């Protein structure tokens, strides 16, 4: 579905000190931005921010950064962060393909990828956020033995992503084809997940760790 342009979104985001407009300036300096030594976790494709805010409020000792491309979506994530008074969140409006310019070696402790675009056509697969090209970039700034938590409702993407992780030097430490019937207790539900689980969608989930 095409999002209607919200011309007011970018000025409102730029006016907030929770939005990082030039993130490359913070490479290697994110702990200075948060003013603490807590771990930094990323959500790639954070959407409207429910997952991000819930995680941050439940884990105030951890710093969270949500990244997404569309201002029309991110403005709602920002509003949630402000309403929640979650000081341990920053929002970055950015194409994730540029992420290598934003984080330095060993600067990030975990990545969450929730229901990303499956890019099913062969010529599009390199755009997948779990593709080996992206995974090898993430490894440049993830700490040793860090984890990537990945959720999707697309079986093809899920099964091919397992191959991507192994090829890129990750072990798969946990996997389920039906997260909500798995007994896994640390799941935080996204807006998309909540809506479509109620319609019968099964969520596939894995935790991959750098070997």
Curated annotation (Swiss-Prot):
<keyword id="KW-0489">Methyltransferase</keyword>
<comment type="pathway">
    <text>tRNA modification; N(7)-methylguanine-tRNA biosynthesis.</text>
</comment>
<dbReference type="Pfam" id="PF02390">
    <property type="entry name" value="Methyltransf_4"/>
</dbReference>
<comment type="similarity">
    <text>Belongs to the class I-like SAM-binding methyltransferase superfamily. TrmB family.</text>
</comment>
<keyword id="KW-0819">tRNA processing</keyword>
<feature type="binding site">
    <location>
        <position position="43"/>
    </location>
    <ligand>
        <name>S-adenosyl-L-methionine</name>
    </ligand>
</feature>
<feature type="binding site">
    <location>
        <position position="68"/>
    </location>
    <ligand>
        <name>S-adenosyl-L-methionine</name>
    </ligand>
</feature>
<dbReference type="GO" id="GO:0043527">
    <property type="term" value="C:tRNA methyltransferase complex"/>
</dbReference>
<dbReference type="InterPro" id="IPR003358">
    <property type="entry name" value="tRNA_(Gua-N-7)_MeTrfase_Trmb"/>
</dbReference>
<feature type="binding site">
    <location>
        <position position="95"/>
    </location>
    <ligand>
        <name>S-adenosyl-L-methionine</name>
    </ligand>
</feature>
<keyword id="KW-0949">S-adenosyl-L-methionine</keyword>
<dbReference type="InterPro" id="IPR029063">
    <property type="entry name" value="SAM-dependent_MTases_sf"/>
</dbReference>
<feature type="binding site">
    <location>
        <position position="153"/>
    </location>
    <ligand>
        <name>substrate</name>
    </ligand>
</feature>
<dbReference type="InterPro" id="IPR055361">
    <property type="entry name" value="tRNA_methyltr_TrmB_bact"/>
</dbReference>
<protein>
    <recommendedName>
        <fullName>tRNA (guanine-N(7)-)-methyltransferase</fullName>
        <ecNumber>2.1.1.33</ecNumber>
    </recommendedName>
</protein>
<comment type="function">
    <text>Catalyzes the formation of N(7)-methylguanine at position 46 (m7G46) in tRNA.</text>
</comment>
<feature type="binding site">
    <location>
        <position position="121"/>
    </location>
    <ligand>
        <name>substrate</name>
    </ligand>
</feature>
<feature type="binding site">
    <location>
        <position position="117"/>
    </location>
    <ligand>
        <name>S-adenosyl-L-methionine</name>
    </ligand>
</feature>
<feature type="binding site">
    <location>
        <begin position="190"/>
        <end position="193"/>
    </location>
    <ligand>
        <name>substrate</name>
    </ligand>
</feature>
<dbReference type="GO" id="GO:0008176">
    <property type="term" value="F:tRNA (guanine(46)-N7)-methyltransferase activity"/>
</dbReference>
<keyword id="KW-0808">Transferase</keyword>
């Amino acid at each position: 579905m095409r999002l209607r342009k919200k011309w007011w979104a970018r000025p409102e985001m730029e006016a907030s000190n929770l939005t990082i407009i030039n993130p490359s300036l913070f490479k290697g300096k994110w702990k200075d931005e948060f003013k603490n030594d807590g771990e930094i976790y990323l959500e790639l494709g954070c959407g409207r921010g429910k997952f991000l805010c819930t995680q941050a409020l439940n884990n105030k000792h951890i710093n969270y950064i949500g990244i997404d491309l569309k201002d029309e979506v991110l403005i709602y994530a920002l509003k949630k962060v402000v309403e929640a008074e979650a000081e341990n969140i920053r929002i970055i409006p950015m194409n994730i393909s540029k992420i290598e310019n934003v984080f330095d070696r060993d600067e990030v402790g975990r990545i969450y990828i929730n229901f990303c675009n499956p890019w099913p056509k062969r010529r599009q697969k390199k755009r997948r956020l779990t593709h080996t090209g992206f995974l090898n970039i993430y490894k440049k700034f993830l700490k040793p033995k860090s984890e990537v938590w990945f959720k999707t409702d697309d079986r093809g993407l899920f099964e091919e992503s397992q191959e991507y992780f192994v090829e890129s030097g990750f072990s798969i430490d946990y996997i389920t084809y039906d997260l909500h019937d798995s007994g896994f207790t640390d799941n935080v539900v996204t807006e998309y997940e909540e809506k479509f689980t109620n319609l019968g969608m099964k969520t596939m989930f894995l935790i991959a760790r750098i070997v």
